[in-house]
Each structure stands twice: as structure tokens, then as C-alpha cells.
Amino acid sequence: MAKKSLIQREMKRRILNRKYSSLRKFLREKIDKVSSLDERWKIRKNLQSLPRNSAPSRQRRRCFITGRSRANYRDFGLSRHLLREMAHSCLLPGITKSSW
């Protein structure tokens, strides 16, 4: 299981992303529309002044039960270990073990 501090840090990043996403989107659209180089630099400076952790590229997908950061399935939000356990225990509806 991941450290609690890592899980909390990821939650903080998710909250910051939601808070600043509309402003970030607005500034990016404004950069595309402006033709003056000086204006672009000013808008870029405003974009850089936003918190670093509010960028979506700083987020990492984690298992919502264990907090594991690697080998996650997007559809379930689970790591491969828990997905296997829960599928064998019939806790995930519609999931069957394949055989051919």
C-alpha cells in the first residue's frame, strides 16, 4: 500500500486541477488568439504564475483502494493485483476469466 502522504498529495493535485482548469483553459485560448508577441509573453507569464500542481500532467492515476501508482486499469480504477482478486471473488460484475 502506498504511503498516506503520497495519496494525500495526489488528492491535493486533483483539487488544484479542478480549481484552476477553467482559468488555464481561458489563458491557453487567449494565447492562440493574440498575434502580438508582447501580449503572448504577458499571458504566458500569467499562465506560469498558476500553481505547478494545478497542471493536469502532474497528476498520476492511482488505485483508489491501495494507492498503487503502477499497473492501473482506467476502466476500474484498480491496480492489477486488486482487479485479479476482485474478479476471482466475483466482486466485479460482468468480468469473466477468459479461456480458449
UniProtKB/Swiss-Prot annotation:
Where mainly located? plastid
Which SUPFAM superfamilies does this entry report, sorted A to Z? Answer: Glucocorticoid receptor-like (DNA-binding domain) (SSF57716)
* One Pfam assignment: Ribosomal_S14
The entry's localization annotation reads:
Plastid
This protein's record includes keyword Plastid? yes
Q: Which keywords label this protein? A: Plastid, Ribonucleoprotein, Ribosomal protein, RNA-binding, rRNA-binding
Q: Which domain of life is it from?
A: Eukaryota
Q: Name one GO cellular component term.
A: small ribosomal subunit
Q: How does it assemble?
A: Part of the 30S ribosomal subunit.
User: Its family?
Assistant: Belongs to the universal ribosomal protein uS14 family.
Provide the protein name.
Small ribosomal subunit protein uS14c
Q: State the encoding gene.
A: rps14
